[in-house]
Amino acid sequence: MRSIRSVATLGALVATAIFGFACGGSTTPAASCSKTYNVGLVTDVGKLSDKSFNANAWQGVQDAVADSSLCIKARVIESNQPTDYQKNMQLFIDQKYDMVVTVGFLLGDDTLAVAKANPTVKFAIVDYAYSAPPPNLTGLIFREDQAGFLAGIVAGKMSKTGSIGGVYGLDIPPVHKYRVGYENGAKYAVSSIKTLGVYQPPSGAKSFNDPDWGKQQATAMFGQGADIVFGAGGNTGNGALLAAVQANKLCVGVDVDQFVSYSDAQKCLVTSAEKHIAFSVKTAITDMVKNTWPSGGLLTFDAKNGGVGISPFHNYDSQVPAAVKTMVADALKKLADGTLQTGYTG
C-alpha cells in the first residue's frame, strides 16, 4: 500500500484540506487537457489517519490525479464530526466541483441528500448502496464473499488444529458475505475444517466498536480449539486480532491490508481479506471523465475486475506453503471467470 501524503491544517475551516493537481502531477493542466475536472473527497470522522477506508479512498483520487489522461484536480476535506458531512460536501458544490466522493456508510444519508439537491454534480460513495438513487449518484460496493473465500483458503490450510474462528460485526450484508465466503473458502481448502463464528449483537455506539467483546469472543474460540481467527467487524474485529496476538495464534484482517493499518496485530496477521478501495475510486472518477457513468447507481468490484483479493503475507510469506499460494491464485482465477462460486446467495 502506498504511503499517504501529509495533511496541512487550515485553522479557519471546520475541515482539513489537501490539494493535488492532475495531468502528470503538474501544478497546471497540460496542454493536452481541453478540460480539467475538479474532484473532491469528503472523509468520515476517521480522517486520512485511519490508514483504512479514508486513506485508501484518497489514494484512489491521487491515482486519478497521476493519470495524465484524466486531467484531474483534487482536494480532500477531513470531517471532524458527523454534522460536518453536508457542510463539507457543500464547500465543493459552492466551488463548482465536477464530482464529490464520500467514504462509508456514515455518510450515506447526507450524500443522498446533497446529490438530490445538486443533480449536475456526480457523486460516488465508497462501500454503500442505495435502492433507488438519483442518476448522478453511484455506490461503490464489493464482493466481500470472494475476498473472504480467498482468506478462508489460507486460514483452512494454515490451521494446525483443524478449527478456525471468525468474530464479526453486525449481521448486515457486507459482514454476512465475509463470513459465508471465509467459512466456505476454508471448507473448499480442507473439507473437514471446523468453523466457529459469532456476530456482534446490536450494541448502539459500540456496534463495530467494542474491542473488549471481540477479544472475549476470540479467546473463547481459542479455548474451543481454533488456532486462527478472522476479525471482520471494525474495532470489534480488531479486538479479536489482539486476542490472537496475546494467545500466540494466527489471525486474518479485513477490508484493507491491516498489516499496514493496524500494526498492533502484525505479529499474528497472515493476510487480510481486502477491498481494493483505491481502485474503485479511480474507476468511478474515470467513468465521470469518460462519460461512462454507470446506470442503476451501482458499481460492483469483484475478482473479475480486480476489485477484491487478499493482502500480501508479509512476515508469514516464508511460512505459507507454495501449494497454498497456488491454490489461492487458482481460486482467484476461477472466481473471476465464474467457474467457482463462494456459496453466498443473498
Identify the residue ranges that each predicted region occupies.
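A residue-level marker of the well-folded mature domains of exported/periplasmic proteins
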Residues: 29-346
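Bacterial signal peptide processing site
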Residues: 24-26
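Bacterial N-terminal signal peptides that target proteins for export
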Residues: 1-11
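C-terminal motif of bacterial Sec signal peptides marking the signal peptidase cleavage site
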Residues: 18-22
